[in-house]
UniProtKB/Swiss-Prot annotation:
Protein name: Leucine--tRNA ligase
Record's subcellular location: Cytoplasm
Listed GO biological process terms: leucyl-tRNA aminoacylation
EC number: 6.1.1.4
GO molecular function annotation: aminoacyl-tRNA deacylase activity; ATP binding; leucine-tRNA ligase activity
Domain of life: Bacteria
Residues holding ATP: 584
Family assignment from sequence similarity: Belongs to the class-I aminoacyl-tRNA synthetase family.
Motif 'KMSKS' region per UniProt: ranges: 581-585
Primary subcellular site in the record, as a coarse category: cytoplasm
Location of the motif 'HIGH' region: 42-52
Amino acid sequence: MEEKYNPSAVEEKWQGYWAEHESFKATEDPTRKKYYLLEMFPYPSGKIHMGHVRNYSIGDVIARFKRMQGYNVLHPMGWDAFGMPAENAAIQHKSHPAKWTYENIAYMRGQLKTLGLSYDWDRELATCDLDYYKWEQRIFLEMYKKGLAYKKSSAVNWCPKCETVLANEQVEDGCCWRCDSPVRQKELEQWSFRITNYAQELLDDTYKLTGWPERVLTMQRNWIGRSTGCEIDFPLENGLGKIKVFTTRQDTLFGATFMSLAAEHPMALDLAGDAQRAQVEAFIDKVKKTDRIKRGAEDLEKEGVFTGSYCVNPVTNTKMPIYLANFVLMDYGTGAVMAVPTHDQRDFEFAKKYNLPLKVVIQPEGETLDPAAMTEAYTAEGIMANSGRFDGMGNGDAKEAIADFLEKEGIGKKTVNFRLRDWGISRQRYWGNPIPVINCDLCGVVAVPEADLPVVLPMDAEFTGEGGNPLARVDSFTTCTCPQCGEAARRETDTMDTFVQSSWYFLRYCSPKFSAGPLDREKVEAWMPVDQYIGGIEHAVLHLLYARFFTKVLRDLGYCNVDEPFSNLLTQGMVIKDGAKMSKSKGNVVDPNALIERYGADTARLFSLFAAPPEKDLDWSDQGVDGSYRFLNRVWRLVYDVLPVIGEAGAVNPDSLGAEAKKLRRAVHKTIKKVSEDVEERFHFNTAIAAVMELVNAIQAFAAKDAPENVAVVREAVESVVRLLAPFVPHFAEELWSQLGHDTVLEAAGWPGYDAAAVVDEEVTVVIQVNGKLRSKLTVAPDAKEEEVRAQALADDKIKPYLEGKDVKKVVYVPGKLVSIVVA
């Protein structure tokens, strides 16, 4: 064994061994319990960063731990490879997106391999591979046939810099999630997936996801946003139609004094009178330039315009002016709001600004509100007033009674509404999966016949940076023949949102080379669901919701029998340096390559796992990295020093051990127990590593003598340290295991179990309190009888002075911990 630890030599040796022996290749085996471990796959941006190192190290610990426990582990890796950065790079470097992407993949794959991550590289996939995206096109066509994919004209979020559509979930504080540019509203024909068909199931099944963080589940439930209420028809005053409203507050219907419509409402221009048309058109144009997020904000200044038209409150028969309002969205309900200014704050602010009438219909119990004196809306519970037959009822009871009344009178109906909107997937970019449809002037939208799939991205697109979709400028791609009528037609040039590819990759990993369809159902059933998924919380209502939706769709299409894709979810924190997330713009990036070159991959892994619990942000510390490296050197030196002594040591005989040897053995087995629980039950890798560090201190402090039983204890202790470190620092641990004389790898050795008898303390310390104050301590056997402990406590020399001349009222014993004496 070399005297000094040489990380590069050790890591090169064991990475070569794992590759040669295909150590992490997963095959279906019904005789073994499966464990599917997955981290969210990366975008091949060029280089991995410390966030990747941390994320993938967390996953690798779990994968290696489960292998040592005997599980059949699937741990794959791939690339979320379509997307806009590749096009931008093509423009900047005058290189094709495919070339840039595949070069990045090759480089990043090499980086991941240097970290010693236990991936089954045989299952590697890239979403830009034809063998991947062709099956996605087939899935799209099956969804189209089922009515789950459709095209329609609608107002969309448009990023002028990226020149593409964004889903609602991709707009953050009014800006594009990628480039941070302000988002505008634009009317476009676009393809969407009918995720709303699954809204109720997506909501219901969140309550089955007991292995997910409650924060993520709450975010999804709020995004889906189920509301129970009524749809109510408000006739137009001219008798030429009606406005349909969805409300959850039918108890306030008698107080509705005006109507607010979204600027995008289909009736908005039709309702404009001649005198108001110019104002209405100007207002609509202004609102369409404001993003949805700002329009929904509570602090938005309320603005509107009178259309010149009126509708009629169906229960009071009073005339209600119809306004367009900037805070009303087409995304929710019907895009029309019955305005009740006395009981809704936004309506109140709007009514005050435009001098609209106020009518109180819910009074606080025992009080009377005066509309003229109100300074804000009354939104609490109360007693119905000015509401006809419902006066005097509590407004909660009135909700149900009014809903029944509306249905009986044919004015409205009870209904459920969701905040969730259908998922717009059209993107005006080249580097994405082509949508497999043809646009024909005679036949309309025509699906590409399955026999003609895949629709392949042309390689001769030009990337000029002049804007627009490069795909639309490739005549050889766009010009085609209609498969129905045989006339000239034009191929769809929109490509699919990259979140489509990441919505099913975890299923494809189960059979990545399957050539008869998207999924091999038998293999999917062998591996799914993913037992542990790891990724950032920023994906809570994007990728994680879409993946759940897609899994349910593929189930209903007959490809799998899985309801939910991910049984357990761990959302890891960020890597922070100098008080901010690492980024090039902030100049606080740490290059993993430089770190590995100096210290080795195992040190990089150890620091990223030891510095903080996985779910918390990790504060970068150069001293912490040095400390991790010193610890590994200390363990290496420990093995080097004791190896000549313990080489021939036999098994431990617990009955022949002296007090110090027993103490060390107890520390060993307590550490095994703690590390096992910290890794398996809590993912508290930091405390697990800290426990191993303490054990190393205990071994070094133990003076090994020539007595055979002492040598055996030291060998057991050292081997336990190596086995416990194996998931965290795998190259290092394998090398030490080999040097200790083992001809099998650590996975074959298995995870160590602890001796239950060895972890029991021979003595425990019991504190003695008198009237709640600590006065002394006792050392007793763990199984000492209560009477004995009480007697010792009362006879303790330090306790006697507090009992003299006092009456002992009560003595309480908490086994192994406390004797509480109460005196008066």
